[in-house]
């Protein structure tokens, strides 16, 4: 997967096509299937800017490392917002630091690793919205849920189900108006 992702990103950075000569594909093809566009296009951007047109193993893993670092800070911030206690956020930071999946996700350049980071950022803004009721947090939550849809194919299925369930719950408890749910859905799209 890493090799196919890297080669597609290199081809996109140099020629604007994937390795099968599809011009700027929405859903790039990998060996025996597709791959999510977010990692591919992030890596193509890095190849054009930071890598000066060259692809290296280090450059291939930079998005995964940055996503893992962002997940660490977003995860601890989310726990602090939910529990309103620094002890819980320190415990969450410790658990993230020793979690084998978290450690391995920074080592492999797989597009599925971006889904966890993007959905955590979306949930952080959603938690902030439920606490502050500010429109800015609702819009940012919707935008990041929309970005999550481009991070991994499974999110095409999971994110809409989650958003429908949470919207129905918030409407039932009168925590959100129907107009704001529609705005949130528009931001996801």
Annotated model-derived regions:
Residues 58-83, 121, 125:
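Transmembrane-helix motifs of polytopic, lipid-linked glycan transferases
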Residues 92-97, 145, 149, 163:
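Short helix- or helix-capping micro-motifs
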Residues 143-144, 159, 166, 175-189:
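Hydrophobic alpha-helical membrane-interfacial segments at the cytosolic entry of transmembrane helices
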Residues 14-17, 34, 38-66, 100-101:
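Juxtamembrane segments of multi-pass membrane glycosylation machinery
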Residues 83, 122-140, 148, 169-174:
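Membrane-interface transmembrane helices that cradle and orient dolichyl/undecaprenyl
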Residues 116, 139-143, 154-172:
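Transmembrane-embedded, aromatic-rich helix segments that form part
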Residues 60, 101, 107-112, 154:
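Short acidic/glycine- and proline-prone juxtamembrane loop motifs at membrane-interface regions
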């Amino acid at each position: 997967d890493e090799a196919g992702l890297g080669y597609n990103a290199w081809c996109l950075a140099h020629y604007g096509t994937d390795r099968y000569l599809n011009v700027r594909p929405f859903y790039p093809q990998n060996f025996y299937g597709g791959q999510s566009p977010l990692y591919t296009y992030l890596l193509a951007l890095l190849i054009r800017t930071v890598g000066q047109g060259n692809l290296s193993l280090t450059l291939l893993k930079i998005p995964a490392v940055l996503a893992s670092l962002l997940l660490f800070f977003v995860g601890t911030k989310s726990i602090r917002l939910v529990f309103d206690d620094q002890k819980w956020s320190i415990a969450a930071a410790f658990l993230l630091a020793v979690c084998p999946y978290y450690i391995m996700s920074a080592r492999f350049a797989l597009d599925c690793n971006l889904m966890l980071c993007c959905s955590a950022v979306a949930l952080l803004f959603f938690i902030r919205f439920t606490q502050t009721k500010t429109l800015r947090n609702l819009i940012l939550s919707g935008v990041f849920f929309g970005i999550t849809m481009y991070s991994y194919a499974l999110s095409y299925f999971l994110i809409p189900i989650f958003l429908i369930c949470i919207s129905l719950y918030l409407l039932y408890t009168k925590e959100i108006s129907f107009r704001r749910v529609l705005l949130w859905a528009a931001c996801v799209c």
